[in-house]
Amino acid sequence: MTLLDGKALSAKIKEELKEKNQFLKSKGIESCLAVILVGDNPASQTYVKSKAKACEECGIKSLVYHLNENITQNELLALINTLNHDDSVHGILVQLPLPDHICKDLILESIISSKDVDGFHPINVGYLNLGLESGFLPCTPLGVMKLLKAYEIDLEGKDAVIIGASNIVGRPMATMLLNAGATVSVCHIKTKDLSLYTRQADLIIVAAGCVNLLRSDMVKEGVIVVDVGINRLESGKIVGDVDFEEVSKKSSYITPVPGGVGPMTIAMLLENTVKSAKNRLN
């Protein structure tokens, strides 16, 4: 069994981005990511701090807009519009979730696609579905693909199962795997017999937010397992969606949690931001 070490790979990517940023600065461009946080969700605050720290580590300027939970939708849209027209800002990220009175889809669609470094704008989703690399790809699925590529895992012809059909991970992940030549099945909350799919799979990507959802009796020998789940137990321990101790015994490759997909997600956010800044140079 080989651990897919996202922490080590993300550190390498950050070093490469640091060099790219030095080049951009020599051309008068400072990569800049604007992050908007609405309210005081503790988990969201932690994520925003980690993103700001990661930006600092590789030479990206980070702007954090921490807004009151009672901000109106129009006020938030006005801020995004200002950032859309600010040439010094190359990436805009709105930290989810948003308060109930704000329409998430409307907010995400208001970010100009050329600064949508999360890859959620319909234009970028369209590029992905057409198999084009013109836009920005969603960070978590992109991070998974980079991780698999780094370990020279050939996806062509593999039977891949994705557990979870969200617009953030499951659906774009399915499209990326399809574009890479895999045969893809997407399982979700309505799937009647999950094991029927997972037992045949060469590659399983789990992104459901459910502790121990994937167990050893549900996988075949030699399976490749990518655990996107992040769950905090009552003890405070962070675990994924996979019964790691048992499933790892049958796996050829598996990601740990933490230290697998999480660091890669942030690395891809940084990479997309630098890509946007480089586009400005071109």
Curated annotation (Swiss-Prot):
Tell me its EC number(s), please: 1.5.1.5, 3.5.4.9
Assigned GO CC terms: cytosol
| Pathway the protein takes part in | One-carbon metabolism; tetrahydrofolate interconversion
**Primary role:** Catalyzes the oxidation of 5,10-methylenetetrahydrofolate to 5,10-methenyltetrahydrofolate and then the hydrolysis of 5,10-methenyltetrahydrofolate to 10-formyltetrahydrofolate.
The major lineage groups are:
Bacteria, Pseudomonadati, Campylobacterota, Epsilonproteobacteria, Campylobacterales
The record's family statement is: Belongs to the tetrahydrofolate dehydrogenase/cyclohydrolase family.
What are the entry keywords? Amino-acid biosynthesis, Histidine biosynthesis, Hydrolase, Methionine biosynthesis, Multifunctional enzyme, NADP, One-carbon metabolism, Oxidoreductase, Purine biosynthesis
NCBIfam families assigned to the protein according to its UniProt record, in alphabetical order: PRK10792.1, PRK14166.1, PRK14186.1, PRK14191.1
Hydrolase as UniProt keyword: yes
Q: Where does NADP(+) bind?
A: G164, A165, S166, I189, I230
Q: Which domain of life is it from?
A: Bacteria
| GO-annotated biological processes | L-histidine biosynthetic process; methionine biosynthetic process; purine nucleotide biosynthetic process; tetrahydrofolate interconversion
Assembly behavior: Homodimer.
Protein's recorded name: Bifunctional protein FolD
Reaction(s) this enzyme catalyzes, per UniProt: (6R)-5,10-methylene-5,6,7,8-tetrahydrofolate + NADP(+) = (6R)-5,10-methenyltetrahydrofolate + NADPH; (6R)-5,10-methenyltetrahydrofolate + H2O = (6R)-10-formyltetrahydrofolate + H(+)
Report the InterPro entries cross-referenced here: Aminoacid_DH-like_N_sf (IPR046346), NAD(P)-bd_dom_sf (IPR036291), THF_DH/CycHdrlase (IPR000672), THF_DH/CycHdrlase_cat_dom (IPR020630), THF_DH/CycHdrlase_CS (IPR020867), THF_DH/CycHdrlase_NAD-bd_dom (IPR020631)
GO terms for molecular function, please?
methenyltetrahydrofolate cyclohydrolase activity; methylenetetrahydrofolate dehydrogenase (NADP+) activity
